[in-house]
Amino acid sequence: MATGWVVLIAVIALLVGAAGGFFLARKYMQDYFKKNPPVNEDMLRMMMASMGQKPSEKKVRQMMQQMKNQGK
């Protein structure tokens, strides 16, 4: 009977730990994306304009493709 209780408690602890880890990781990622949003085309245009470059559509798409390839 004691072995059954140990197994039951271990399974419950595993489930609680997995659920807790999931929600903690989810909260962390939500906060991270709130502080550091992913770069999009509008942000690239603003960055290029602030550097004194004329943000043509071709340049913006090239930079987005380079950033996507760099992440791989």
Curated annotation (Swiss-Prot):
It is found in: Membrane. This is UPF0154 protein EF_1734. It holds the Pfam family UPF0154. Belongs to the UPF0154 family. HAMAP family: UPF0154 (MF_00363). The keyword Cell inner membrane does not apply. It comes from Enterococcus faecalis (strain ATCC 700802 / V583). InterPro entries: UPF0154. The chain crosses the membrane at residues 4-26. Keywords: Membrane, Transmembrane, Transmembrane helix. Its main location: membrane. It is a single-pass membrane protein. GO terms for cellular component: plasma membrane.
